[in-house]
């Protein structure tokens, strides 16, 4: 197969012009722009075959044309006799009359050059040298397009390359044989008179020879009696140029230049698939019927027609946009934007939309919108990578027993950390700021019991109310919970919250009644209080084990551990497959200055080894190093083992799932998709709904406190953020957390704070490097905290300080108008007697008449005692004053007051 060629090169090989070849390519469906465009080998082969077949047809047409075509054309005048027949046998020098039929045997003279518009006479083939060169080209252009096969058997209309219909139902006429109707005679050289019914070569070829006729050259109408009657469908006579063929069945005596009335014309197909001509009558097409049916089924919302869901369920991810919703239901996103605007919500098509907004729009068009939960969304993501989380691989024979994971929960300062210190024989609580736990600690301890050593994994969760989310994560990651309640304090709010977390996680609870060594301890009271919350002691006929202990004096600690083991063995089947790829949960994560991101994880199933590719939430990496709770290196970690993992590219969120994947590429893709979905969800959550009603209020200036949060671990930052966002002061001020992160305060944080006028809250971290110098230079305020509730209190105080002050009116005195004096310089002067307190110059006053307040914001513009100006007048003295309110009368009471700022609670 030949290589690629340009259009003009192939045209030269085929012996045609580039214009003709371009037209042929378009007819064949190959849309080529210019003659310099290249053509693929299959198209070249197709064009060669087309022109080879066309060449054979042209040769056959040339062979049959002199004999067949003129004979058939000259046969028509002989069938119908004219009213006045032409005389046969004209002189050789005389031109034939317009109505005379040519003789079949007549041939043109060898030396005679026919007119450009003349065609060969019947019976003789024209010689190649008898016509001029441009005439041959014009004839070739005129004949060639008609000899080409057209798609669909019709000719394209005018210059519309997309049309496939003809301009009329009649066939396009070919070149007429000369002499059939009023052929021009080779008259005198000076004879410019237009012939009667002169013919012209039909087609798209250029006009050759002859001058353009003028009105003086117009011939008079011929006598119809002297002309042969036309056959139906023949062309009318021409005035200087040939008439066009008339429609079939409507021929008549031709008048110069007018075409015969055609039959019913078919509509021409327009460009780009639009139907042309008059609309069709009759039955509608299936497409039209289906389109009309779909339009009728659409639901109108605020003037916008949208598809009616009919109660269908649409599942959308968190933070989905209107474009995602439109893709699900097959609608135009712009239509959804307009519909939501008509409902009072202003949202763009690509912005993340809240769940409430999506459900509101779905209910309007009869769709039930279900926002996929984070768990389902993550499961679908893992399934797309052929991964599963939460199931052991293999059969029951692959499962082995694993140690229980126990969470110690309870109210703040009830002794949870002291209990763990006693079990581990360490002093963990001494290192906590303020004596309260502000992170989750994970430890594994071996306990010597009567039946041998047993391993237990402990999780210590914070008890402060700000750490609700951390306690919930601790409950979800554990098998059993120890509820610590102080015997001298009783059930407290965080105690109840811990019970609810345990019930939600469906885990058994062992109650440790602590501090029984104190004189005011009352264990029976604790048992009675917990019975109200569903924790019934065994001695009361329930199924909850209660153990009275003293963590400080190491009383009954072994009994508590034995109760934990018994409960785990009786109520739980703790097994896992250690031979599969590791799966676990991140209990805590922080950014270490020397080691980078460090995540504390508990392996739930499988075994984690050095070098494994892991993904933890939106962080991924390869396990570079693992440490246990004592700082020792660990090569591999089995089920229920807590370890610190290094090697991640970022700090994961507390509670994120850990998963070992095939390679780093898969881990990176999963982490990237999780990060994108997380950002979309946060945008939808942070976006404030703006309705048309409160648009003016939103546009007004409001006081906003911008904060940047930095902490030592992800859980503390999350707890601090939730606690700060829960502060309710007033709608006049807003709290905006523009950034959050784990690790020391950096120069990037300071630059962002300077650009956004924000305050940096540093929790258990300090500024590093030149961040402090830059903060001092930029005037950025960095607040350092080690106890969370102090940060909450100061931020709340700052928000209250941003509130607009409230002013209270306090009366300072009163005066009665006794007389009025007119002055051209200052207006009306009120002669008054101060009856109470005192009045001051430029002070605010109320004007009271007959017990009604006439105005409440008047002002004393001038104050005099006799002829002297005075700043204030006390009770019992007369004075003259000029008020800013001129409509005053004798007997009016002037009440002076001042506005005093009132502190806001």
UniProtKB/Swiss-Prot annotation:
Location of the region described as G1 in the Swiss-Prot/TrEMBL record: 410-417
Keywords associated with the record: Cytoplasm, GTP-binding, Initiation factor, Nucleotide-binding, Protein biosynthesis
Region (G4): 514-517
Gene Ontology CC: cytosol
Domain tr-type G: 401-575
Compositional bias annotation for Basic residues: 280-290
Residue stretches of biased makeup (Gly residues): 233-276
Any Pfam family hit: GTP_EFTU
Localization per record: Cytoplasm
Source organism superkingdom: Bacteria
UniProt region (G3), positions on chain: 460-463
Keyword Nucleotide-binding: yes
Main location: cytoplasm
CDD domains referenced in this protein's UniProt entry, alphabetically: IF2_eIF5B, IF2_mtIF2_II, mtIF2_IVc
UniProt keyword annotation of ATP-binding present: no
Chain spans, region Disordered: 50-306
Biased composition (Pro residues): 89-125
Family affiliation: Belongs to the TRAFAC class translation factor GTPase superfamily. Classic translation factor GTPase family. IF-2 subfamily.
NCBIfam families per the UniProt record, alphabetical: IF-2, small_GTP
This protein's name: Translation initiation factor IF-2
Species this chain originates from: Corynebacterium aurimucosum (strain ATCC 700975 / DSM 44827 / CIP 107346 / CN-1) (Corynebacterium nigricans)
């Amino acid at each position: 197969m030949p290589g690629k060629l340009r259009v003009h090169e192939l045209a030269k090989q085929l012996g045609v012009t580039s214009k003709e070849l371009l037209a042929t390519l378009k007819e064949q469906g190959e849309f080529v722009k210019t003659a310099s465009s290249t053509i693929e080998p299959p198209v070249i082969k197709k064009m060669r075959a087309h022109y080879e077949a066309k060449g054979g047809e042209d040769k056959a047409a040339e062979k049959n044309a002199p004999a067949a075509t003129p004979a058939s054309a000259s046969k028509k005048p002989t069938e119908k006799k004219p009213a006045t027949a032409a005389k046969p046998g004209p002189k050789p020098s005389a031109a034939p009359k317009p109505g005379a039929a040519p003789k079949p045997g007549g041939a043109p003279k060898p030396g005679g050059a026919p007119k450009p518009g003349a065609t060969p006479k019947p019976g003789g083939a024209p010689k190649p040298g008898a016509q001029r060169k441009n005439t041959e080209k014009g004839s070739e252009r005129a004949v060639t397009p008609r000899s080409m096969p057209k798609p669909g058997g019709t000719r394209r209309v005018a210059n519309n390359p997309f049309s496939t219909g003809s301009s009329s139902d009649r066939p396009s006429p070919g070149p007429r044989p000369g002499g059939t109707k009023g052929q021009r005679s080779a008259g005198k050289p000076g004879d410019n008179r237009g012939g009667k019914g002169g013919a012209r070569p039909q087609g798209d070829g250029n006009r050759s020879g002859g001058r353009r006729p003028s009105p003086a050259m117009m011939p008079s109408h011929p006598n119809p009696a002297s002309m042969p009657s036309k056959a139906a469908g023949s062309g009318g006579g021409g005035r200087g140029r040939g008439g066009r063929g008339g429609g079939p069945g409507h021929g008549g005596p031709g008048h110069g230049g007018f075409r015969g009335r055609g039959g019913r014309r078919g509509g021409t197909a327009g460009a780009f698939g639009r139907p042309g001509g008059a609309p069709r009558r009759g039955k509608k097409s299936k497409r039209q019927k289906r389109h009309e049916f779909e339009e009728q089924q659409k639901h109108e919302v605020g003037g916008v027609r949208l598809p009616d869901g009919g109660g269908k369920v649409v599942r959308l991810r968190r933070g989905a946009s209107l474009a995602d919703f439109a893709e699900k239901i097959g609608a135009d996103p712009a239509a959804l934007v307009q519909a939501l605007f008509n409902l009072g919500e202003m949202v763009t098509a690509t912005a993340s939309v809240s769940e409430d907004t999506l459900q509101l729009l779905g209910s309007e068009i009869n769709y039930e919108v279900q926002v996929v939960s984070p768990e389902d969304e993550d499961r679908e993501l893992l399934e797309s990578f052929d991964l599963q989380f939460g199931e052991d691989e293999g059969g029951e024979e692959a499962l082995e027993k694993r140690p229980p994971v126990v969470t110690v929960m309870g109210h703040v300062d009830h002794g949870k950390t002291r209990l763990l210190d006693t079990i581990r024989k360490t002093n963990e609580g001494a290192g906590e700021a303020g004596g309260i736990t502000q992170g989750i600690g994970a430890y594994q301890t071996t306990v010597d019991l009567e039946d041998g050593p047993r391993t237990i994994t402990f999780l210590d969760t914070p008890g402060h109310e700000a750490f609700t989310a951390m306690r919930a994560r601790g409950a979800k990651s554990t098998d059993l919970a120890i509820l610590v309640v102080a015997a001298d304090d009783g059930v407290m709010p965080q105690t109840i919250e811990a019970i609810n977390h345990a019930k939600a996680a469906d885990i058994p609870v062992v109650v440790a009644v602590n501090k029984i060594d104190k004189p005011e301890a009352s264990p029976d009271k604790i048992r009675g209080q917990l019975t109200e919350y569903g924790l019934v002691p065994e001695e009361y006929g329930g199924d909850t084990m209660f153990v009275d202990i003293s963590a400080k004096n190491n009383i009954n600690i072994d009994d508590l551990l034995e109760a934990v083991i018994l409960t785990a063995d009786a109520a739980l089947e703790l097994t896992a497959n250690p031979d599969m790829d590791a799966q676990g949960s991140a209990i805590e994560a922080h950014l270490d200055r020397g080691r980078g991101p460090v995540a504390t994880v508990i392996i739930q199933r499988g075994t984690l080894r050095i070098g494994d590719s892991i993904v933890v939430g939106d962080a991924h990496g390869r396990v570079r190093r693992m440490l246990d709770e004592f700082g020792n290196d660990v090569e591999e970690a089995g089920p229920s083992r807590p370890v610190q993992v290094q090697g991640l590219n970022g700090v994961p969120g507390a509670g994120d799932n850990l998963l070992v994947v095939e390679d780093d590429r898969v881990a990176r893709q999963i982490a990237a998709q999780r990060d994108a979905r997380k950002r979309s969800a946060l945008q939808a959550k942070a976006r404030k709904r703006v309705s048309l009603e409160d648009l003016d209020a939103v546009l007004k200036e409001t006081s906003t406190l911008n904060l940047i949060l930095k902490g030592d671990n992800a859980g503390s930052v999350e707890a601090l953020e939730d606690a700060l966002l829960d502060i309710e002061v007033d709608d006049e001020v807003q709290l905006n957390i523009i950034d959050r992160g784990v690790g020391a305060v950096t120069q990037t944080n300071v630059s962002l704070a300077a650009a956004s006028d924000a305050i940096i809250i540093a929790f258990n971290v300090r500024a590093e490097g030149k961040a402090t110098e830059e903060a001092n230079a930029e005037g950025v305020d960095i607040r350092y905290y080690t106890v969370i509730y102090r940060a909450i209190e100061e931020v709340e105080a700052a928000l209250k300080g941003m509130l607009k002050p409230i002013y209270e009116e306090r009366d300072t005195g009163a005066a009665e108008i006794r007389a009025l004096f007119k002055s051209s310089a200052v207006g009306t002067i009120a002669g008054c007697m101060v009856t109470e307190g005192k009045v001051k110059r430029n002070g605010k006053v109320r004007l009271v008449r007959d017990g009604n307040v006439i105005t409440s914001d008047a002002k004393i513009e001038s104050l005099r005692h006799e002829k002297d100006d005075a700043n204030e007048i006390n009770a019992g003295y007369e004075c003259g004053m000029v008020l800013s309110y001129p409509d005053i009368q004798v007997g009016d009471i002037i009440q002076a007051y001042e506005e005093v700022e009132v502190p806001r609670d």
